[in-house]
Amino acid sequence: MASTYLAKTYSGSGNRQRQTISFWMKRYKTGAGQVVFSSYYTSSYYAYVLLGGDDRLQYYNHNNVNVETNRKLRDVNAWYHICITLDTTQATEADRLKIYINGVQETSLNTATYPAQNAEVKFGDNNLHEIGRHDGGSYFDGALSHFHFVTNTAYQASSFGLTDATTGEWSINTAPSVTYNTNSFFFFFF
């Protein structure tokens, strides 16, 4: 997927305070900045979910939101489930944005600048959204599956995955109970 992407410009805004981004990914290349999902309005107003050059997962939004894991995602043979939940209405700062990898919340963070209470992010706004790149570059080099973007609800990772009783591994929930609202979507991709 090193030069392919999907793009959509929304005509109106969805809920920008409560959201969920959930997807499964397999990386083909590490050590280079790769954007999985982005929202772009201008060079000053944008957001993205990025795998940095150091292979850490990062959620960035132009209005001083920057949350990056300490964990590095370097295994090109593994599928990773990523779930990012946003609820800026929460009183506790760390509850406003959570990152889960394979069903486990990442609490050891390299950077943790959370959204202000009741802030709105660029994802879900009436601007360009892209899966697989940001503003014409930083292409994601890998495979994606079961990609959900949901506005209006901050679902937990357990809505999209479950622990296999036989193997003990985190696996895809192929029939999640999810409500898709304005500007929400689901792509199977596999």
Regions found by a protein language model. Name each.
Residues 65-66, 120-144:
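Extracellular glycan-interaction patches encoded by glycine-rich segments
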Residues 21-29, 82-84, 131, 144-149, ...:
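Short hydrophobic/aromatic patches on beta-strands that form ligand-binding or substrate-lining surfaces
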Residues 23, 77-88, 99:
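Short tryptophan-centered beta-strand motifs in secreted/extracellular beta-sheet-rich domains
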Residues 1-19, 65-74, 133-136, 171-178:
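Short surface loop/edge beta-strand patches of beta-sandwich-type extracellular domains
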Residues 45-47, 64-69, 104-110:
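Surface-exposed loop/edge segments in extracytoplasmic proteins
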Residues 1-5, 91-93, 98, 104-113, ...:
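Extended recognition patches within non-cytosolic domains
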Residues 2-58, 90-93, 153-158:
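Extracellular glycan-recognition modules
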Residues 38-40, 47-52, 58-62, 85, ...:
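Beta-strand-rich, repetitive solenoid scaffolds
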